[in-house]
């Protein structure tokens, strides 16, 4: 199925819709959603990507044409983890402009222009409910938000992660290098506001 995305000018005035391929081919500004699930125990869920084996968002992708951000949040969680949540009460964290210019192995350029809408939502069910595609998501990792924030602050040490697959759950110790950052990003810049939001909400 062809995906259509709404696209905008640099001042974020709506222009029209275009296929996802053409949006990227023509460097058009569009919306994405970054979904984070957390628990009342200050835990936050990361997916472990099958391609990079690093901790990333709980789920993320494009906001389709005509979708609201929260509708996209719900769809992405369903598509990637196969759980249906009520995202209407998801809490806003930030909007992050994203520009990427990357030369590929064939010497052509991949260019991305997006605004990432970052939200968190409370997850109150069992981790065994997950049913994800191992070709896309290797595992899901559950870490304590306070401990993770301290790890990013001191830049050393390890924290305990609960690793969840479709078949088993186990504990392991992980260091800062397991979390995904890209060029020119720091761990606190990428994850600090999210972790702070989860910590504040978990107190409620």
Regions found by a protein language model. Give the residues of each.
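Acidic, metal-coordinating catalytic segment for phosphate/diphosphate chemistry
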Residues: 1-34, 38-40
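A sequence-level detector of short linear motifs
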Residues: 14-17, 46, 172
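Acidic pyrophosphate-coordinating catalytic loop
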Residues: 24-28, 96-114
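A glycine-rich, hydrophobic loop/mini-helix early in the fold
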Residues: 32-63
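The catalytic Nudix box helix
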Residues: 46, 58-95
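Nudix hydrolase/Nudix homology domain
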Residues: 53-54, 100-102, 111-204
């Amino acid at each position: 199925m062809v995906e259509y995305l709404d696209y905008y000018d640099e001042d974020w005035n709506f222009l029209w819709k275009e296929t996802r391929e053409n949006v990227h081919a023509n460097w058009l500004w569009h919306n994405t959603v970054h979904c984070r699930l957390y628990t009342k125990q200050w835990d936050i869920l990361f997916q472990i990507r099958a391609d990079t084996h690093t901790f990333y968002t709980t789920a993320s992708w494009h906001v389709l044409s005509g979708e609201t951000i929260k509708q996209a949040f719900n769809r992405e969680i369903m598509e990637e983890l196969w759980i249906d949540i009520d995202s209407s009460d998801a809490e806003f964290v930030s909007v992050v402009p994203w520009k990427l210019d990357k030369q590929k192995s064939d010497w052509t350029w991949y260019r991305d222009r997006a605004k990432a809408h970052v939200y968190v939502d409370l997850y109150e069910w069992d981790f065994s409910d997950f049913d994800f595609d191992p070709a896309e998501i290797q595992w899901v990792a559950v870490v304590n938000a306070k401990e993770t924030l301290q790890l990013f602050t001191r830049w050393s040490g390890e924290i305990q992660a609960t690793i969840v697959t479709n078949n088993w759950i186990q504990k392991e110790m992980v260091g800062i290098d397991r979390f995904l950052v890209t060029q020119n990003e720091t761990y606190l810049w990428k994850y600090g506001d999210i972790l702070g939001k989860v910590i504040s909400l978990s107190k409620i």
